[in-house]
């Protein structure tokens, strides 16, 4: 019982004990003395000692995304950095293992300064990127520049070499050879079909002219035939028809009634027409 009474009396004193244990806050009256003033960076004579100026690095000001980045200043006599701007975190995610870094596109003949046209691009010392790495500098190389156009031209990457005139490496697809072979075969077959069609057409034009000449010769040698009901007589080309005898002559007025007709006499002697075999 007495312990419970003691705890009930000590509970209100806990805040006072905590305040006495905690250290003083930074915002209290105990402040650090001010730092001494830095000496000005004034360059004196050659014998005067130089003051060491140590400046703290201020945080870079925030730039809006619309403001272009300034060109890096390259000190003459020193090589530019091997990693161009925009590639610090690695090469861009692309399906091509190489990249082309273009320079300014303003000609020097127009009076423009190529180094100040596009401040976001790399200097003229940079060229094409390596096939398996980042861009490599080419300082003072005339072969990387065009004839006054301001474009950076260098050796073509291995992936862009022409197929027929360049080196054939392991990356050539064998299906390309199959496609070329099939295309050549199709062209040859089509040419043969066209030639055969023209030849048959020319032969068909010559045959009717020869057949017409043969028919004309046959018509000139064809004899005349007699189509009478009694019989058929073959007459020559210049043969004369047989003259009928008085017994076989039929009177002009027709057969008289009561007069017998001669036996074997044809009923129609005048119905003779030429027969032509077509």
Curated annotation (Swiss-Prot):
Keyword Membrane: yes
Record note on modification: O-glycosylation at Thr-136 is essential for recognition by PILRA.
Signal peptide, first to last residue: 1-27
GO biological process: cerebellum development; dentate gyrus development; gamma-aminobutyric acid signaling pathway; gene expression; glutamate secretion; homeostasis of number of cells; regulation of immune response; response to stress
Bilayer topology annotation: Single-pass type I membrane protein
Main location (coarse class): membrane
One Pfam assignment: AJAP1_PANP_C
Compartments in which it is found: Membrane
Keywords from the UniProt entry: Glycoprotein, Membrane, Signal, Transmembrane, Transmembrane helix
Residue numbers on the Cytoplasmic membrane side: 196-278
Transmembrane domains' residue ranges: 175-195
Region (Disordered) location: 25-93, 206-278
Listed GO MF terms: protein domain specific binding
Sugar attachment sites: 136
GO terms for cellular component: basolateral plasma membrane; presynapse
Annotated tissue distribution: Mainly expressed in brain and spinal cord. Weak expression also detected in heart, kidney, spleen and lymph node. Virtually no expression detected in liver and embryo relative to brain.
Record topology, Extracellular segments: 28-174
Biased composition (Polar residues): 209-225
Function field: Acts as a ligand for PILRA in neuronal tissues, where it may be involved in immune regulation.
Protein name as it appears in the record: PILR alpha-associated neural protein
Species name: Mus musculus
Biological classification of the source: Eukaryota, Metazoa, Chordata, Craniata, Vertebrata
């Amino acid at each position: 019982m007495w312990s419970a009474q003691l705890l009930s009396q000590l509970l209100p004193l806990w805040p006072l004990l905590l305040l006495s244990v905690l250290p003083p806050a930074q915002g209290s009256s105990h402040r650090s003395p001010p730092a001494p003033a830095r000496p000005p960076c004034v360059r004196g004579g050659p014998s005067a000692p130089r003051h060491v100026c140590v400046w703290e690095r201020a945080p870079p000001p925030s730039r809006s995304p619309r403001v272009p980045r300034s060109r890096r200043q390259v000190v003459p006599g020193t090589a530019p950095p091997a990693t161009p701007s925009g590639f610090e975190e690695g090469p861009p995610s692309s399906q091509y293992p190489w990249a082309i870094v273009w320079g300014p596109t303003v000609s020097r003949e127009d009076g423009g300064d190529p180094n100040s046209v596009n401040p976001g691009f790399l200097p003229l010392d940079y060229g094409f990127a390596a096939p398996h790495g980042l861009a490599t500098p080419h300082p003072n190389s005339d072969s990387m520049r065009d004839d006054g156009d301001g474009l950076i031209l260098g050796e073509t990457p291995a992936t862009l070499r022409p197929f027929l005139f360049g080196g054939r490496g392991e990356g050539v697809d064998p299906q390309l050879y199959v496609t070329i072979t099939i295309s050549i075969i199709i062209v040859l077959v089509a040419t043969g079909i066209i030639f055969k069609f023209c030849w048959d057409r020319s032969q068909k034009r010559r045959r009717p002219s020869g057949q017409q000449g043969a028919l004309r010769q046959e018509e000139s040698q064809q004899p005349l035939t007699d189509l009478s009901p009694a019989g058929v007589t073959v007459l020559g080309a210049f043969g004369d028809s047989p003259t009928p005898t008085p017994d076989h002559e039929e009177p002009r007025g027709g057969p008289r009634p009561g007069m017998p007709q001669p036996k074997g006499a044809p009923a129609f002697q005048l119905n003779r027409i030429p027969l032509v075999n077509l």
